[in-house]
Curated annotation (Swiss-Prot):
It catalyses: UDP-N-acetyl-alpha-D-muramate + L-alanine + ATP = UDP-N-acetyl-alpha-D-muramoyl-L-alanine + ADP + phosphate + H(+). The gene is murC. It comes from Thermotoga maritima (strain ATCC 43589 / DSM 3109 / JCM 10099 / NBRC 100826 / MSB8). Pathway: Cell wall biogenesis; peptidoglycan biosynthesis. This is UDP-N-acetylmuramate--L-alanine ligase. It comes from the Bacteria.
């Protein structure tokens, strides 16, 4: 079958495209711009067109699109004219899973789903279960970063941003939490949002939930939490090299967990994975071995650069909700106790900024200094009055040292470089390219390590 993917550069879309390519289908696609994923797919021999155009046409049997692709996209218009079936990526993915009839491990929720999915996949690979993995991030141990084909169970990250996620029926499901992100896709109805989680839980054999989550804790056959839940934990130690925690089951000491990835939120992610595999009757010794070996996912507290002479770090992180940012900064302060923490934050989506507003500033105030950029729209239309300046204004009202830049190239004017500083480039948009440019500029100008601050303080 010949399949055309419109928006193939997305992390979820490219994973589905890789799956169809590995199944022997004739795959090609288009994207609005070049990305690391489009470059990777092209190297594999998959034809990629940039940008979108009605001329990007190989007479496909099927066109697959993401919700970000509008109906007036020239390729979608042509597909309708040619009477070629058009399917939403999530719908097609659900139908693919139904056809293949494999054991399914799924992870959904607002925060932590990529890392938790990666942990589940890593454990199953360690156990030699040969999983097929669909990941919303890049993990070095997967053949294609965000995808790997196996002959065992399927592990996938399930994006709750679309209400259709409730139509899936995995065998096993971890719900990390549900904080109302993407509520606009549910008619701004919390009842409708909650109902979607309830629906998928009814279609699942075993559900693991966070015991302290108001919306979904009651859905769990098994729960995990800090002090509340079937599985709880007590931190023993945390350093740059390792975290240790005592896991309790039903209030009794059960086992010791060791992790090489930093952050208390990752301890909770690992606890969810332990709850899942223990409830399924797995021997936990190799599960714990796998978790201790786990090295994380790209853009999740990823150290992109370190200069040992000046003790300057550059870290990339995908955090884009207030809770994720709070977890990130708490981790940074634990790992870098004596360094200055500077955050360069790119808000992601106007709808999220409008909904959360002051919550971003409350999370960001944990940093020593904050630079806020303009919003990365993620294909949303700009909303009047909604701007990154809102966060900047809120930070100033909290007495926090903060700066605002409208365009990413202006970052150079406002970032002050000094020794013993950790620079966190944070967001789900294209802020990672600013991180790389920052490192390049720093390396080329080490002889003059100070920069003049801008005037928009």
């Amino acid at each position: 079958m010949k399949i055309h993917f419109v928006g193939i550069g997305g992390i979820g879309m490219s994973a589905v495209a890789l799956h169809e390519f590995s199944n022997g289908n004739d795959v090609y696609g288009s994207n609005i711009e070049e990305t690391e994923r489009t470059a990777y797919l092209r190297k594999l021999g998959i034809p990629i067109f940039v940008p979108h155009s009605a001329d990007n046409w190989y007479d496909p049997d099927l066109v697959i699109k993401t919700p970000a692709v509008r109906d007036d996209n020239p390729e979608i218009v042509r597909a309708r004219m040619e009477r070629v079936p058009i399917e939403n990526r999530l719908h097609y993915f659900r139908d693919t899973l139904k056809r293949e009839k494999k054991e399914e491990f799924a992870v959904t929720g607002t925060d932590g789903k990529t890392t938790t999915t990666a942990m589940v996949a890593h454990v199953l690979k360690h156990l030699r279960k040969s999983p097929t993995v669909f990941l919303g991030g890049i993990m070095d141990s997967l053949e294609h970063g965000n995808y790997e084909k196996g002959n065992g169970p399927v592990v996938y990250e399930l994006d709750e941003s679309e209400e259709f996620f409730s139509e899936f029926s995995p065998n096993y499901l971890i719900i990390t939490n549900a904080r109302g992100d993407h509520l606009e896709n549910y008619g701004n109805s919390l009842t409708r949002y909650r109902s979607a989680f309830e629906k998928i839980s009814r279609n699942t054999d075993l559900v693991v939930t966070f015991a302290e989550d108001e919306l979904t804790s009651h859905l769990g056959d098994v729960t995990f939490g800090v002090k509340k839940g079937t599985y709880t934990l007590e931190m023993r130690s945390a350093s740059r090299a390792e975290q240790k925690a005592m896991v309790e089951k039903n209030g009794k000491r059960y086992l010791e967990l060791k992790l090489k990835v930093p952050g208390f939120h990752n301890v909770l992610n690992a606890l969810a994975v332990i709850a899942l595999f223990d409830s399924l009757g797995y021997d936990l010794a190799p599960v714990l071995e796998a978790l201790e070996e786990f090295r994380g996912v790209h853009r999740r507290f990823s150290i992109a650069f370190h200069d040992p002479e000046t003790n300057i770090y550059v870290i990339d992180d995908y955090a884009h909700t207030p809770d994720e940012i709070r977890n990130l900064l708490q981790t940074a302060k634990e790992v870098f106790e004596n360094e200055k923490i500077v955050v360069i934050f790119q808000p992601h989506r106007y709808s999220r900024l409008e909904r959360e507003d002051g919550n971003f500033a409350k999370a960001l105030q944990l940093a020593d200094e904050v630079v806020v950029t303009e919003v990365y729209d993620a294909f949303e239309e700009k909303k009047n009055g909604i701007s990154g300046k809102m966060i900047w204004d809120s930070l100033k009202s909290l007495g926090k040292e903060a700066y605002f830049v409208e365009k990413l190239p202006e970052l150079e004017k406002v970032i002050s470089v000094s020794e013993n500083t950790v620079f966190l480039f944070v967001g789900a948009g294209d802020i990672i390219y600013s991180s790389r440019r920052f490192v390049e500029r720093y390396q080329s100008s080490k002889s003059s390590p100070s920069r003049v601050l801008g005037s928009n303080k």
